[in-house]
Structure formats: structure tokens, C-alpha cells
Amino acid sequence: MSGRNPAPGGPGIEPRWTGGAKDAVGTAYAISSRIWFTLANGVNTEIYYPTIDCPQVRDLQYMVSDEETFFHDERRNTISTIELIDRGALGYKVTNTDPDGRYSIEKQIITDPHLNCLLIHTKFNVAPAWQGRLHLYVLCAPHLEIGGWHNNAEIIEAKGRLFLHAFRENTHLALAPSTRFSKLSCGYVGASDGWTDLAHNFKMDWQYDSALDGNVALTGEIDLSRGTEFTLGLAFGRSNHAAGATLFQSLCVPFQSNVNSFVEQWHRTRKRLAVVDMNHGKVSDRASCIFARSINLLLAHEDKLYPGAMIASLSIPWGEDKSDDELGGYHLVWTRDMVQGATALLAAGDTTTPLRAMIYLAIAQREDGGFYQNFWIDGDPYWTGVQLDEVAFPIILAWRLWKADALAQFDPAITVSRACAYLIREGSTTAEDRWEEAGGYSPSTLATNIAALICAAEMLEDRGDKHTADFVRTYADFLESHVEKWTVTNQGTLLPAVKRHYIRINPVVTQDGVLVDEDPDNGELTLANQKPGDRFRYPANEIVDHGFLELVRFGIRKPGDPLIEDSLKVIDAVLKVDTPAGPCWKRYNHDGYGQRGDGTSYKKWGVGHPWPLLTLERATYELAAGRNIDVYIRAAEGFATGVGLFPEQIWGLPDIPHEHMFFGKATGAAIPLLWAHAEYVKLLRSMIDNRVFDRIEPVAARYCNDNPRPVIEVWKMNRQVRKVTAGTLLRILAPAPFVLHWSDDEWNTPRDTSSTPTALGIEYVDIQVDPGQKAPLRFTFNWPEEQRWEGANYAVEVEHPAQTVAENSVAKSSSD
């Protein structure tokens, strides 16, 4: 039919996505149904197909008009309620009611349990006084191939049935009710679409049969003469035939049969709830419900075409202000978030999904052992940076699966070895911390790296390579022995009573690869996302976050450690926000990532608001310290929105009603945040066990004791230390065999020492610095494989403890 009456006004206004705050997400628990949907404000927002990182629809909603006095769309003009169709399934009943009582729209929303079709069973209830006077329309905004531009819309006829069809490249969408349309139209958004048509005079006057190459919308009036109860279907395919056939195959099955199959599929996952069901006395009904929801959400965020791939969130934060030039959203893989989710499923007794995740990560790993900061589920990078904690997390997951005897026939040895080598070769500073905005020495990154290295060493030793295992443990010891030196200020100013506390990150100063200064009291941190004209540089020792709590989580530091407790006093004074639900914390002071202070969207700068995730992290620490955590659990549960979804951020300022910002309630950032749901699952498991689930016993056994360990310093090309303390073991590393040509007496007695190899492709030479050594260590490299000398000499000064104390005293006096 298309082409006879094309819509005017192309290509339409600039397309946008919808906001990141979702009330629910849903999908079938079957790999054959490769479609995911989201809900917000009573309507379907982004719909994903055929993979979980590909949103294809902006929104799908009903509109109502009497053709004379009013026109409504569900999102703007109704009062909405939402509930689950079944406690254990991600399908929903949504009721949208006219505030004036003229009508209500009841919707049951699921996906076909076996096909790529969204199904919305609809009852249009009309008040007696308005019977026969109201018209019902459906409006769909396709954003095919992850974009609003270059979409095409047309009306298709098949066997006497008309349906709406949208297409772009090889992706096709078909939309129709189980009854029939009485009118159909295709148009350009903002010019000739159905919403614009109805808003003009409350009538559907336009019936255009096509709108090509633009930001388009599909509109159809439901034929209510056939009844006010029907099922609306929206199907996808690789051609119009495939999409249309899928649509009508789904619609020909009684809706209740599809619901029964949909629910039965999700009930197969109930074994993952046993850890809570068997401990009902320890877990409240509310906690049990959110635990169940969290498990299902974690399972739902795994892709079905790429098994094991788990994204961070089915949302696009502040999507209402994002167009085609910002494709990523949070529907991407971050290894950090993914491993958190897989670990939570392990805590729930699921080993199958975490193993799939491990195998997926093994394939996604770069050849050099690193992982991209985030990536599409096919492995293509979105942001190409590398964060060391994201390299470390897969090692920890592999270790947990190994300890749980859950690796089946999969051998993660190469994945673990390559990641381990990357951490040692490219560390010890990270290009970005877990907040993805600053590089240097981060307590949270160091904690993850230390834990991962100890896990890797255990696995290496189990395979018979004790030599490499000991090498890895020694590097972990080096990191552990420097944590406080690198990330603790002795000149704290944020809380007058606490001078010594952990900081967020120490942005070390280097010059041509040489470390100029690793002192956290001398660094200056540049903050991202700051408002133009505002200050953006601060002394590093004035910026704090919660990252140091990861040291306790993994067993590197003891709960109750005085330095940990003092640091908590600082973050409570600087970052804590007491809300009606309970305490919550900001990421760090002067954070600019969040809803702007006037309530509008984050756009390159804003205000960092509290994160419920951090309430859960604090609860994990308090549990480890043996203290009551009820207040934190109740707070987190109070922050949940919709059907129990944790928001990334809650509004931390006074209410701004016209922007829908209310103190302690969700902002327009991501909902749900799967990292937070994973933390909640692990917290409840930890509470039941009275032991932190994430704690790694070999790590705690090594570091949470008073046993002395050798003092180690590491020199490598990307960390050319300038000084070493007498009595220290200096280990010199390189990624290739070398002969170290060196002297400790100003070249009077030069020596040659061949490097010792490891299975990681990293070689080393150890120099035990004599306690009485005074002359600097001087050295250069001969590279036998390349038959060349380095062409540069290096020096490491030797200092003595008394000398160091004196120098520090002089420096302090000078600063005073």
C-alpha cells in the first residue's frame, strides 16, 4: 500500500530516547524469545531485539480521545499503577486511569514465551456516561538499529489484514491488534505523526501510508466495535514477512496460554531462591521479595544470542536528552558489573549462569590480557580504555568457580594467566578507577588487584607452577605493602579530628616514565563533569570515597581497623545524606555526574547524588565488623522503585516537583542498576551466613595477621622508582628476557645478572639491598633476543629509615 499517500514533514524533529528511570523490565526466560522490554510511567519504553544491547523502539503507548473536548496519552495524562502478574515472573499488570474517571486501561504485558513478539493484553474500560464516545489509538516510535534517524514506516496488507510496518536495514517491526485497526497512519515525529494529529483537534484526520528515511511514528486506531478487550502485538524479524508472520503466530495463541507458559518458564529459576526460602526467619518478607526480583533481573540481563553476556542496565540514563550520537547507554558489558552479577548468582546457588559468564569473558579478553572498559555484546569496544579492576575481576570469578567445582570442562588457565600478566605488566596505577574518571592509585582498584593476584597464584600452584605462583604472590605483597603509602593522607583537612584517612585516588606524577612523586599529600586531582567556570582541580587528599572498604571485603584489611574506622568518620561527615528511608552516600565530594541542581538532566556536567549501592556496600562492611545492619537494609529497600528496582542515584536536594525530583527518590539516572541488585543478593547471603560472601580466605589468611613479610620494591619501565629503603628487596621486571648490567658501588664492580623467567612472559632480577648500602644502585639492560643494549642508564637512590624520617620532618616544616 505504501507510496500512494506519503506523509509530509520529513525527516521530523531530532529523535530522543526515553529517561533512564524504569519501573520494570521484562523478558521471557527462554533463549528463543529474543526480546526485552522496559516500562516507565505506565507505558512501554525501550524495547530490545535481537540482542540485549540493541534498543529498537523508543516507546509504545495508547492515546485516548473523544474527538471533541480532550486528547490524552497514557504517559502524560493518566495515573499509573504496576504490579507483577506473578511473584516469580517478569511480566506485569499496568493500570492507567484517567484522573477524571472517564476511562481506565488495563494492560498485561509479557513477551511471547517462544517468539520475538511483545504482547499487551488490553482492557479499555469506559465509564457508562462515556460509552461509545471514546476512541483508542496506539502510537509507536521505532528507533531501529539503535537510532531514530533513517527509519521507514508503511502500512502493509497481508491476507486481508492491515498492519503497521517499520524497517531499517535488515530489522523489521510489525504492529497490530488481535482485533483490527479502523484507521492507520505513518508520519514524521513533530510534523505528521499521530500524536501531533490528535493534539491538533482531538481527531485522527491523517491517514498517510508511508514515511521514509526519517524520525517516524506509527499510529493506529483500534476498532472498538469488535470489543474493548484485545491483545496488541509488536513483533520483530529480519524481513517484513518474518516480522508479520511472527506477529500473527503470536496473536493466534490465546493470551492466557502464553501467560501460563511465560510464568512456567520463570518458575524454573526458583531454585535460586532456596537460600532465602530456607532462612525465612532471618529475612523479612520485603527482603525476600527484592531478593527474588534481583535474581530475576540478573538473569534477565543476560543476552540470549551471546550466552553469558550480561549488561549493566536495560536503560539509557537521561535518555530523553540523548540522540543517535550517544548509542551506548548502560546496555553494554562492563566486566566489573558483569562479574558482580555473576558472583551474586553464585551466592544464590547458581553455577550455570556464572560459568557462561566466565566463558564469555574469556572470549572477550584482549590478546594482551586486558579488557576494554565496556563493549557491545559481540565484543566490539564502546569505550576503549582499560581499568585494572575490570582486568582483575574475571580472575576472581574463575577462582570462585574453581573453588565451587563449577568449571565443568572449561579451563580458565590462559584467561587467568593473561589477565594476571596484564596486571603486573601494566600496573600498579590504573588509567581509571571504578568511577571511570581518574587514574592513579585507587584503594578499590588495588584491593581488587591484590585479591585477584592471590587467587591467580592459588590456581597456578594447583597446576604445578609454584615458581610463577610465588612470583605473583610477591607482586601482590608489593601492592599490599604500599596501599597506605599510596592512598592515605597524613594531612587530612575534611574532618579536623582526623588527619590520617584513605583518599579516593592518588594521581601520581610522572615525567617520561619516571615517578616524580607518589605522595598522596602532594597530588592534585582533576575532577570530571564539573560545571564550566567552576573549580575542577583539588588537592588529592581532599577528595574521598568509599573505595577503601573493598580492602575489608576481600580480606586485605580487618574490619574495625582504626584507619578504616577513621576514614568512615570522614566519609560520613562529607558524603552521607540522611533521607526518610535511611542513610545514603555520594560517590565522592564535588562529584559532577548526576541530575543538575535545578532538576534537569545531566548533560556533560551536573551534581553527583547519593547512590543506594553505597548504602549496600556500607552494610557489607558493618556486617563484617559485627554490627547490626537493619538500618541499611531498610534504607536500600526504601530506595527501590517500581516493582523493586534499585536506582543508580537518588535525589539528594530539596524537592523540585515540576521536574519530578523528590528528596530521597530516584533521579533520571539508570534504573535498574544491576550492580546494586548484585550487592543486595550478596548482602542477604552474607547476612544469612554471618560472613561476607565476597571475602577470599587465602587473601585474609595472608594479610589479616601480624606475620612479618619481606619489604619489597618493584622497578619497571612504567614505574621507575627513584629511591629504595636499605634492607629492601628490589625486584626489576621486564616483559622479555634481559641481562641486568648493574653496580652498587658507582661502577667500580659491575655485575651481570640474567633475568629469571616466569610463565607469564615477565622476567625479573632481584637485588637484595644491604642494610648498610649507601651508594645508589645503577643499572642498564642488555636484551639478548634483540642483541642490543638499552642505551640508557638508570639509578635508584638508597635511603635509610632515619634519613627518610628526617627528610619528611624537613618537608613538613617547610610546608608549615
Report residues per predicted region.
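Acidic/polar, glycine-enriched structural segments that form the non-catalytic walls/loops
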Residues: 1-9, 101, 112-119, 123-329, ...
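An extended acidic
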Residues: 4-96, 174-195, 272-284, 735
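Aromatic-rich carbohydrate-recognition surfaces in CAZymes
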Residues: 126-128, 151-154, 168, 224, ...
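Extended ligand-binding clefts on enzyme/binding-domain cores
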Residues: 148, 161-195, 281, 286-290, ...
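Long, well-ordered core segments of solenoidal/helical folds
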Residues: 297-306, 349-372, 411-432, 474-494, ...
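Glycan-association/targeting regions that enable binding to alpha-glucans and other polysaccharides
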Residues: 695-816
